Structure formats: C-alpha cells, structure tokens
Regions:
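Intrinsically disordered, low-complexity non-transmembrane regions of multi-pass membrane transporters
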Residues: 1-27, 168-173, 227-240, 276-283, ...
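Interfacial segments of multi-pass membrane proteins
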Residues: 103, 196, 316-331, 337-342
Length: 396
C-alpha cells in the first residue's frame, strides 16, 4: 500500500511494528473477510444438527459466539498474557477439523457437546507444555490422512445443504433438491471459482464470501430471503455462560482430545509459517508453546459461553505473506472487528437470513479445500509400500 512505501523491510517483518491507523484498519478488515465464512459455517451446521431452525434465535446465538470468541482467542495470540499467546499475527477461528466429532456430540445433546469442548480445550492447552516434543509423531502422512478424511466426510454435508439443507425436516420440504436451490449453490461455486483464478489480492482471498454475497443478492430478488429475524434481533447482547448446559460424556471427551492434538499440530505449523514467511526466521519454542496455550484456553472459554473450538487459520497466514505486513497490531484490529460483530445479534441474524442453499454452495467449496489441503500435505510423502498400506487402511 502506498502509505507503507517508506517503511523499512525490518519494520514490516517486525511483529511489534504499528502501521498508521488507516492502514491497520484496511489490513485488519482484510483478515476478517478472508476468514469470515469459514468461521461462522461450523456454527450453522451444528445448529442444524441440534434441531435449531435456520434463522432461529439459537442459530443466531451460535453465530454470534463464533465471531466473539474467534476475536477473543485472536487477542490471546496477538497480545497474550503471561505464557499464553504467540504474540504474533495469528488469526484464530472456528475449526472445521472438529466438525465430524461435533456433529456426533450435538446429536447427544448440546450440553454434551460443550462439555467436550471445554475439557478438550483444557487438554489442548496442557499440550503446550510438550508440543515441540511430539511434533515428530505426526508426519505429513498422518496429518494429511486425517485432514483428507475430514474433508471427504464433510463434502456430502455440503451437497445436502446445497440441495436445501440436511436432516429430515429440510429434506421433507417440497423445494428440497429443486432447481432454485441448486441454482443458488452453483452461482456461489462459479463466482468463487472465477474470482479465485482471475483476480488478485483480497478479492481472490475473499472469493467464497463474495460468491455467497452474489448469490444472496440474487436470492433476495427471487424472494427467498426472510428478513424478519433481523428485525427481531437485538442491537446488543452479552454472552450467556452454560446456556445449553454442561454434560460429561467420556466418548465425546476422548474424541475432542484426539482432535485437539491435530489442531495443536496445525497451529504449530501455522505459527512456523508466519515466522518463516513473515520474518524469515524459525519460530521459537516460546512462541509455539504460547500459541498452543492460547489455542486451548480460547477453546475452553468459548465452550463455556456457547462457542465452538478455535484454531489458527491458515488462509490468514497466506494473507500475511501476500501483504508483507507482519504486524500483530493489524490482526489485533481484526480481532476487535470480530468481537464487535459478536456483540451485535443483528449481524448474526443477517448471516442466518442467508438461504441454506447459498451456504451449501460455499461449504462445498470450503470442504473441498479441506480435502485438498490434506492431499497437499500428502504430496511430500515418500510413497513406498509401507506408507501406501498405511494410507489405504487409514482411508478405508
């Protein structure tokens, strides 16, 4: 950006550098746009599994909490307290990796889900003490298989949403699988594809969001958008602890803890990527430990108030490389944006007013990208007979 032309490379690579306010606001908003859809989508999916109507007050609440606690967890990373936080520009958001586990837990009850999230988050934070020592247990073969399997599991969910929604209630509607739903989903996919490959910068990074906005506007003209929920929603609301209860289920807790290990390894990779790509150095043990602490504590606190598990967002790591600005104050501004959005139910209601087929088009793209990320991890694997056998059995 023109206002950064006179800034030295040393400052741009310095996490403590504070750019001019107008630059920080623009860059911070870019970080929010790059992660917004990925952050709120898991909440909408879990709301559907829990039986909450699309656009209901409970769905709006879960969307709010996903924004609010993504912002709070990000502040834990950028500002930190004590040993908590990498103190690097690490953007946090709701993790897709936990969605398969959360779907099963939500079917048992929301109290069971949030009990698992809180305890899983505490276990995640505990791993910060020794995360560096167990990284070698999760080579690209293991991590890649897990991420690929998650993506493959989730893609059918996206297809159901594109058709008009998952679950018996949505699938029993006469419009389910109709041309109107598929048309909206396909518009999202085509616009996202076009913007990703034929534009650059923040437009390319926000291609899925812009694709969904395009389809949303078309849906308004089709008469498929109900604005009544926005009118009813309040302008301001605080989070409510244990709104859905807190129940202990050993199976769910074990599953959450296992996925926390995967999430912790992902965060370590993202922090390493930020340090290497943004500052041309290796991440320190203190940064890796602090980042893992923030990941876990952010998840545990979110679970208390109805938020879902948080992790670092890889797309924002790429955005740092693209802008060349390593400043953690920029991501702090992004966190403040998210917190403000999370305190305004009308924003959650606006997101929830989106036709479910529009969301379906977006999640087909995003879940496909999750699977692609797993394949990318596997590209560095030495495909000998041993590894091929491990891959075949694990994927089956």
């Amino acid at each position: 950006m023109s206002t950064l032309e006179n800034v030295s490379q040393e400052d741009l690579k310095n996490p403590d550098y504070v750019p001019p306010l107008q630059v920080g606001l623009v860059l911070g908003l870019q970080h929010v746009l790059a992660m917004f859809v990925s952050n709120v989508t898991p909440s909408i999916i879990i709301a559907g599994v829990a039986g909450f109507a699309f656009g209901s007050a409970d769905t709006v609440f879960l969307i709010q909490m996903s924004m609010l606690f993504a912002g709070i967890a990000t502040l834990m990373q950028t500002i930190g307290f004590g040993p908590v936080g990498a103190r690097l520009p690490v953007m946090q958001g709701t993790s897709f990796a936990f969605v398969p586990v959360m779907i099963g837990a939500a079917k048992m009850g929301m109290g069971t889900l949030f009990g698992g999230i809180v305890i899983g988050g505490l276990f995640h934070a505990f791993m910060g003490s020794f995360i560096g020592k167990i990284r070698h247990w999760f080579p690209p073969l293991v991590s890649g298989i897990i991420i690929l399997a998650i993506g493959i599991y989730l893609i059918p969910v996206g297809i159901q949403y594109a058709a008009g929604g998952a679950g018996e209630f949505n699938m029993s509607k006469p419009t389910w699988g109709g041309l109107g739903n598929w048309s909206l989903a396909i518009i999202v996919i085509l616009v996202s594809f076009g913007l990703k490959f034929w534009t650059k910068g923040i437009i390319s990074s926000s291609s899925v969001l812009l694709g969904m906005i395009t389809a949303y506007i078309i849906a308004i003209f089709m008469g498929d958008v109900n604005f009544s929920g926005i009118d009813k929603a309040a302008w301001f609301a605080l989070p409510e602890p244990f709104k859905y209860g807190f129940d202990i289920n050993l199976t769910v807790i074990i599953a959450m803890c296992l996925m926390s290990i995967v999430s912790a390894i992902e965060t370590v990779g993202d922090i390493s990527g930020i340090a290497k790509g943004g500052a041309n150095r290796e991440a320190t043990d203190k940064e890796l430990q602090g980042g893992t602490y923030a990941d876990g504590i952010g998840t545990a606190v979110a679970g208390i108030f109805g938020g879902l598990p948080n992790t670092s967002f890889s797309q924002n790591v790429g955005l740092i490389s693209m802008t060349g600005v390593m400043s953690r104050s920029v991501v702090t501004i992004a966190a403040i944006f998210l917190i403000l959005c999370g305190l305004v139910p009308k924003i959650g209601a606006l997101v929830s007013s989106m036709p479910i087929a529009v969301l379906g088009g977006g999640v087909i793209v995003m879940f496909g990208m999750v699977a692609s990320a797993g394949i990318n991890m596997l590209s560095s694997v030495n495909w000998n007979r041993r590894n091929m056998m491990i891959f075949a059995i694990s994927l089956s």
